[in-house]
Amino acid sequence: MPEAVQTQDQPMEEEVETFAFQAEIAQLMSLIINTFYSNKEIFLRELISNSSDALDKIRYESLTDPSKLDSGKDLKINLIPNKHDRTLTIVDTGIGMTKADLVNNLGTIAKSGTKAFMEALQAGADISMIGQFGVGSYSAYLVAEKVTVITKHNDDEQYAWESSAGGSFTVRLDNGEPLGRGTKVILHLKEDQTEYLEERRIKEIVKKHSQFIGYPIRLFVEKERDKEVSDDEAEEKEEEKEEKEEKTEDKPEIEDVGSDEEEEKKDGDKKKKKKIKEKYIDEEELNKTKPIWTRNPDDITNEEYGEFYKSLTNDWEDHLAVKHFSVEGQLEFRALLFVPRRAPFDLFENRKKKNNIKLYVRRVFIMDNCEELIPEYLNFMRGVVDSEDLPLNISREMLQQSKILKVIRKNLVKKCLELFTELAEDKENYKKFYEQFSKNIKLGIHEDSQNRKKLSELLRYYTSASGDEMVSLKDYCTRMKENQKHVYYITGETKDQVANSAFVERLRKHGLEVIYMIEPIDEYCVQQLKEFEGKTLVSVTKEGLELPEDEEEKKKQEEKKAKFENLCKIMKDILEKKVEKVVVSNRLVTSPCCIVTSTYGWTANMERIMKAQALRDNSTMGYMAAKKHLEINPDHSIIETLRQKAEADKNDKSVKDLVILLYETALLSSGFSLEDPQTHANRIYRMIKLGLGIDEDDTAAEEASPAVTEEMPPLEGDDDTSRMEEVD
């Protein structure tokens, strides 16, 4: 037996090859070893997860070729702490690694996540995120000073990898105890990390992190028990003791702890009895809980769901809501879906994997980034789907064509929407959900025509009547006026901006509620959401706004149109191509004018959003953004005085300047940007000068900026000062 150990540790014949760690890996290991982390326990979670992945792989291969399991049918993970040697060993009967795998996976080829993880660590990220970056195996160095990996793959010999993390590692052929197939990771623990050899501590970590691993995790602990034997037996045991020293892991070992007093206690005609301590190996399965999604939902507590959610997602917070269901009939599958408490910071990044639902087929893990399983707008959902009908050896290409998967997807979307609707009944929790995932709901309305109606019921908005509460479209409809035919909304940047907008003046005066849409995605959402419960959605910033009015109001409006028809024509001539038309408004109360867009063009807000796109299409910008209509308020003193001025002398130069000033100011107040802000600013400065009584021909001003004075649009001189004051 000692010879075998010697061969394993220092093989005489086999050559030992030494390799250097790839620079990034060496850097990562140095970071792990030299930094203090409070939660070092995650090393065990990572190593058990790696074992589970290796077992998944061999099980997956055996489905098409059962002979792959001839080297060991029992799929399991064993944990063996050894206090005497200060080692913790993790053994699995997974797929194992070839020599090439060992060299590549454990040292010479950096995973894509290595650099990203180091950057995250240096930025203050938690070490427990290591598994998400594909470098979990290096977490062993949180607790170990040396790591030995012995592995056997069906297609190769048994090899041993070893490193003390000094920048290099060795690989050699291993002649030790044959594994059959699988991997044995031996951690030679640091002096101050012996807590991880304690039975209680190992159980605690496995329960916390690896309870739902699909393979049995067995813990082997050496224990002692009292046993009564006769004197003769005790002597025999003493003689055998030395021979058995090497076999303590496999057979009980006995040591004499009998005392003289015990020897004196005899039963007349019976032989002397002796009490001895017997060592034995206690084996205990740590994860008897079967996969939670296969159990009856009525038997599962919220705490169990919470534990499973955390083990599935590595989230530190509890989930917000859960949906556990099974579908039976022509198609059978079980699913467990979770809504997280908060959205990840990179939720809408293109490079991010598109979903987080793990796909299992008959309890065998297949993949965790199957894009066909759930639409992109639901990519924040977490969970598992376990199908009974998909073939186990299904490829990505086959999945894309699979009708079964399309049915599963349809059911998952349906159940997600059911879950959100249930969540909406709890105002407090729905508020948390909506703050995090409202963009996803709106994206769904834009993309998913089939479920648009259900998704629209989940929308919540501030309105002119809701105060600080967000309300649903259904709530809005129940509060509509008797003669109101439309749902009115306005889009903009902030709640205050839209609430003070000129567009909502008359509606608010008439007590008509207006929905405030203040997220950029709302613009895309309402392009697709044309109506709600038979009521058309109407933007108050677009032309042709129909407000409920009686015959008398209609008659008055017609009279005003006739009265201001001439002014509208003059203003259109002055503004030329800047606007499509100038009309009398029915939406203004306190503002003199506003700019509205055509029914099918972009709103001012949409134009702003599109201008901000780095890859925008300028040709689209041209025809979508050009249709502007100027609406004037016939009841406003500025417009009335301007009408009188224009009718008195339509060639009056100040009229032209005032019209342009009104137009540019209306552009700004309506949410558009100015093409030439400097010219507008100069006009305003001249108005200020007139207001302050400063002589326009002031020579000092001319000397200061002669060029600007020349370029400035003409405002009439002193003769017109009184006229300007009239307009004010």
Curated annotation (Swiss-Prot):
Matches recorded under CDD domains: HATPase_Hsp90-like
Activity regulation: In the resting state, through the dimerization of its C-terminal domain, HSP90 forms a homodimer which is defined as the open conformation. Upon ATP-binding, the N-terminal domain undergoes significant conformational changes and comes in contact to form an active closed conformation. After HSP90 finishes its chaperoning tasks of assisting the proper folding, stabilization and activation of client proteins under the active state, ATP molecule is hydrolyzed to ADP which then dissociates from HSP90 and directs the protein back to the resting state.
Gene Ontology process terms (BP): cellular response to heat; positive regulation of cell cycle G2/M phase transition; positive regulation of cell population proliferation; positive regulation of nitric oxide biosynthetic process; protein folding; protein stabilization; response to antibiotic; response to cold
The UniProt record lists the keyword Coiled coil: no
Keyword Phosphoprotein belongs to the record: yes
PROSITE patterns (alphabetical): HSP90 (PS00298)
Region Required for homodimerization, residue ranges: 678-728
Binding site for ATP: 50, 92, 111, 396
Function text: Molecular chaperone that promotes the maturation, structural maintenance and proper regulation of specific target proteins involved for instance in cell cycle control and signal transduction. Undergoes a functional cycle that is linked to its ATPase activity which is essential for its chaperone activity. This cycle probably induces conformational changes in the client proteins, thereby causing their activation. Interacts dynamically with various co-chaperones that modulate its substrate recognition, ATPase cycle and chaperone function.
Domain writeup: The TPR repeat-binding motif mediates interaction with TPR repeat-containing proteins.
Subunit structure as annotated in this protein's UniProt entry: Homodimer.
Protein name: Heat shock protein HSP 90-alpha
High-level lineage: Eukaryota, Metazoa, Chordata, Craniata, Vertebrata
Gene it is expressed from: HSP90AA1
